[in-house]
């Protein structure tokens, strides 16, 4: 039948409809949907400790350094999982930083940042300026490092002349976490003032703020520039610039630590005693590790192929993909 152009009215002719075709053939099989499979982390090794481990740090691609609540700094060889040596600090270890080979900076519950030569088991010097506990240490380049404290300040230090060259002010409560961003000239801090802040550490300028509902306790960054935050509101947020793109809310307590595994997956450790592995492409949790019996405090993606966790259950656990 031709198209009615509307210029003339077609005759009113009724055409018989063809009979419906009835078939008893069953519908064809549905195509199976592809099933995404994920490798799982399994426990490969465990250290039983005499005190709570508070920090994990990789050394020389094959060693692990730990800090503990009784002030002990221990160095393990992960080729044989043997303790090589240890150093005793006077205060609870909150963070560790290797600035150059054998030279370790410690942040503790005192206001001092101490420098140790671990090969000589000797304290070399102290960096003085903070007024309260030093929670974070980050190496910025071959000359400078940054520290963050419960005194609400971030300090930029010249490692070689032991001087503070800049103080970054803007948070109004304790600062819990600090990372250097991919472009190297910027850092990001997380605070009990319910924000994460981006800074140009070379000028001291605050570049922007990422809001949370509660304390921000953990940070990491992906290779595409996205920042991941976690905190006491039990959520993990993925930020695209200054806009929150995705929120993950499966933890039942504070998210204490975050670890970038390979830019597609991250791990989170929580006060709910669990570690969760997240697929950031699918935006979902693909594994929950429940083998810790107390709060998960720190995570480390070690170049030996281990995801390492420590907990207030006084254990360090080594996980590997199978």
Where on the chain are the PLM-derived regions?
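Short loop/turn segments that connect beta-strands within beta-propeller blades
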Residues: 78-81, 118-121, 159-162, 201-204, ...
